[in-house]
């Protein structure tokens, strides 16, 4: 996700699925992501607020992501902030009840992929 429109599409897709979701939300503000992450306040996270079992927030703006989710109505006892992606992934996987949904910004997606390759759970090429 990189802007409200992209985030809203992800959120609406998740809202179509039954049950609660365990989420790893990774918000970075690197150049390729865009330094200004205020767009998260324009995304409709409220659509999932009551359907998030647990959210682990990570990335360079992990605290901002958690704050946005709090204001969207996600109870604080369902939120965790872990800026280190590796530690956040460990925490999110350990707390997940089955499937874990990752919602990263662009550079976070690249970092997450590298982390998964390093752990041997993803291939090293895109092909």
Please provide the spans of the model-predicted regions.
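ATP-dependent carboxylate-amine ligase
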Residues: 1-127
């Amino acid at each position: 996700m990189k802007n409200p429109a992209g985030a809203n599409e992800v959120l609406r897709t998740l809202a179509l699925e039954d049950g609660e979701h365990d989420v790893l939300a990774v918000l970075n503000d690197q150049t390729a992501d865009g330094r200004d992450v205020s767009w998260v306040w324009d995304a409709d996270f409220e659509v999932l607020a009551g359907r998030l079992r647990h959210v682990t927030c990570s990335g360079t703006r992990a605290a901002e992501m958690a704050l946005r989710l709090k204001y969207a109505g996600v109870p604080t006892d369902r939120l965790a902030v872990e800026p280190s992606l590796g530690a956040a992934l460990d925490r999110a996987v350990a707390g997940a009840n089955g499937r874990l949904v990752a919602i990263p910004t662009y550079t976070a997606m690249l970092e997450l992929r590298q982390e998964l390759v390093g752990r041997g759970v993803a291939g090293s090429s895109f092909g």
